[in-house]
Amino acid sequence: MAKFVLAGRADCPYYAKAELLADYLQKNLPDFRIHKITQHPDIWEEWLKDLCKKNRWSHNKSPIIWRELLDRGGKGLLLGGYNEFLEHAQLYYGVTSSMTTELMKRVAQENLGTHIEKELEKESLKGLVNPLQVWITSASSLACYHLIPILTSGEVFGPQMEISINLFDNKHTEEKLISHKQEAEDLASPCLQSVSICTQAEEAFHGAHVIIILDDHVDKEINSLEDCIRSRAPLCQLYGSLIEKNAHNFAKIIVGGKTFVNLKTALLMKYAPTFAHNIIAVALGVEGQAKAALARKLKITPSCIKDVIIWGNISGNNYVDLRKAKVYRYESAIWGPPHYSRPVLSLLFDREWVNREFVVSLKTLTATGRQFGGMLAAHSIATTLKYWCHGSPPGEIVSLGVLSEGQFGIPKGIVFSMPVKFENGTWVVLTDLKNTEISQQVMTRMANDLIQEQLVALGELANFQPYQSENLI
């Protein structure tokens, strides 16, 4: 079977003439098939350039005709333009075209009008669906790769909510973004309406309902901690201005990862003040690491442990609070129904392990980022988003990085991880919890580091001087 593709500028007279000839051949020859593509004059040249680059062809006029040896989408063999197609029809089929110049021009204008009508119809149909626009920054990362299938599963936003995923990263990562896009489409998820790629900053976050900020790339070697901190400010300033300009009025912005999570959240709040209350930092990754360490010690599964609280700097100096932590389904002489729980600290008899080894191991994981890979980052972000949309489990404490308003004696104006619950599409700080007082020394240590990070990032402090004190449980 001879399968041809005819593509051209919608207002091109020669496309109109080639189209008439192709229609005649398809009608009269049983094994001749034609697929037609029109492009608006404003985008034709760029579309043709991309097509030729992809297929390694050399062609710069309208129309362009190629033959596909397989069904549409198979390997293409360039035939050429109108003249080459006419010559091919004469030699192989003994058919030519006698269309007049006047008729060519008239049909070309009709083609342009039809093309514009079809495009407007497509846009109106898209408007009827109105999917949730989800934007992911640093989208070439491993965390994004693991995040996409969770977002498209229907577990986060609900099985009835259609989403459009927008992958945003720099131009150098375009090949990896294309790979992520193709794999996402291969999932064939009923919740996924479309996947798009964005490498132009000015186009980022248009109509965004959800924005996920992942760890940014480090393109050059950074010699000092201060330089590393300062390097976050320009990107957060760019993101903040784009969010203010392009995002939906009630967009949810969630910051995840393993480096300067609180700092990036605070900077985004500064540069996108309209959305400050809707910007949060994910702490569930660190919370999960703490639960896993406890579970290994108690020889149970991590999901049996609830209400571990992470205070302070999610990716820096923090305080893992076990005073409210509970264990469910623990095998011992005492058993109860599924809702029966026991305090974690009552089952950990090795206080030396709790106060030393447990603390040091978690501090090392936080400081180095080890074992905080793409899978953990993706799961903690997705779970936090699910809670934000549908509420956290009743009675369960969730750790979250939010802007302090002075709760628990925390200094105002810093992003601090603290206990919250999610309900009715928002989060509420659990200020009524009892026995959650934090010693002045621990509070000073955590707050001091967060304040210094912000001052260094904004250029108001030259050197970062971490608070010298041991981490205590």
Swiss-Prot record:
MF terms in GO: L-malate dehydrogenase (NAD+) activity
Record flagged with keyword NAD: yes
UniProt cross-references to SUPFAM superfamilies, sorted A to Z: LDH C-terminal domain-like, NAD(P)-binding Rossmann-fold domains
Keywords: NAD, Oxidoreductase, Tricarboxylic acid cycle
Record's signal peptide: none
Gene3D superfamilies: Lactate dehydrogenase/glycoside hydrolase, family 4, C-terminal, NAD(P)-binding Rossmann-like Domain
Alphabetical list of InterPro entries matching this protein: Lactate/malate_DH_C (IPR022383), Lactate_DH/Glyco_Ohase_4_C (IPR015955), Malate_DH_type2 (IPR010945), NAD(P)-bd_dom_sf (IPR036291)
Pfam family, one: Ldh_1_C
UniProt GO BP: malate metabolic process; NADH metabolic process; oxaloacetate metabolic process; tricarboxylic acid cycle
Enzyme class: oxidoreductase
Annotated EC: 1.1.1.-
Similarity comment text for this entry: Belongs to the LDH/MDH superfamily. MDH type 2 family.
Name the record gives this protein: Putative malate dehydrogenase 1B
